[in-house]
Amino acid sequence: LKRFFADGTTGDYIFLVDEAHNLVERSREMYSAIIYKEDFLLAKKILKKYGQAKLMRELEKCNRVLLSYKRECEKYVIYESIGNFAFELMNVASDLDEFLQKAPEFPERKDLSEFYLNLRNFLNIYELLDDHYVVYAEHEQDGRFKLKLYCVDPSKNLQERINKGNATIFFSATLLPVGYYKSLLSTETDNYAVYAKTAFREEQKLLLLGNDVSSKYTRRSAGEFERIASYVKKTTDAKKGNYMVFFPSYKMMQQVCDVFLEKCQSDPSCETETLIQQPGMKEEERESFLQAFSEKLSGERKGSLAAFCVMGGIFGEGIDLKNEQLIGAIVV
């Protein structure tokens, strides 16, 4: 890829970006950077073993700055500028680079190299800072204190990459509101959007909402799982066919599935077959999982199929179940 897209290189390329709704958040993180105060103390501790007094002093300067940020931060603090601190970081990066090149192998080389690379990335992102960024400090839940260069609007950075080709097509089933995505994926103002009609007929759609249940962590209980499982069973009993039931986590999926299976076992008329997605499924296991959706069509199943899956997982997108192979989706 470097051969095609080195600095200053362009070509007759068309970039096709699938699932483009994910690109905004991924670009934000890609063009953002974080440093942790605790990492400076760890690096200082390592370098003390090897008599690197100058580097230790430079790391201590950075630690003192981060300590001052930490003391004034209750939850988070936004900074207009960190120019002086960035200069101190440059000194550390330069001398640490020299040390790593000259030093023989030592047990902590991997840890120190990771610290150096993270520091370099932070400084590289610092060079990109403009009004599309926010610089803030925050206490994380695990107690660590971080300083983050957060790319709120990645459009400028993405446009530099887009300009390396002749055209870019962003496509997704969920690029709405389209104005929001257009403003964050490109700086051009004359981009246009094409809306493709759904292949499904409106009269064939039935949208049902269960407003008395929630997937919030604070709401998760035996009673909540009972109500969700009841909704799943009522749906699969009402119309024979193949369904996918999506959950936010493996744990919640298993908890509701257990209740659902108990309900089916206690109901003699229930002929619903159940599948459940497993973590780290191999290719043959995935194929077997999907093959079950075609069995009903060949008369091998008496009742419905309820496939319990995890949202954002391997069965959440990129599969092609045609016609009656999938008649409904339940999203918890």
Region locations from a protein language model:
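A short beta-strand element within the Helicase C-terminal
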Residues: I319-V332
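Residue-level signal for alpha-helix termini/capping positions
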Residues: N163, D237, S294, S298-R301, ...
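Conserved motor-coupling elements within RecA-like helicase/translocase cores
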Residues: S266-C309
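Conserved coupling segment at the C-terminus of the helicase ATP-binding
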Residues: K2-M244, P248-S269
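Conserved RecA-like ASCE ATPase "motif II neighborhood" in helicase/translocase motors
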Residues: L1-G11, F289, V310-F315
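Extended, charge-rich low-complexity interaction segments
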Residues: R227, V232, G299-E317
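Short coil/turn connectors at secondary-structure junctions
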Residues: T10-D12, G165-N166, K302-S304, Q325-I327
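Generic beta-strand/beta-sheet core signal
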Residues: V17, F171, N211, F246-P248, ...
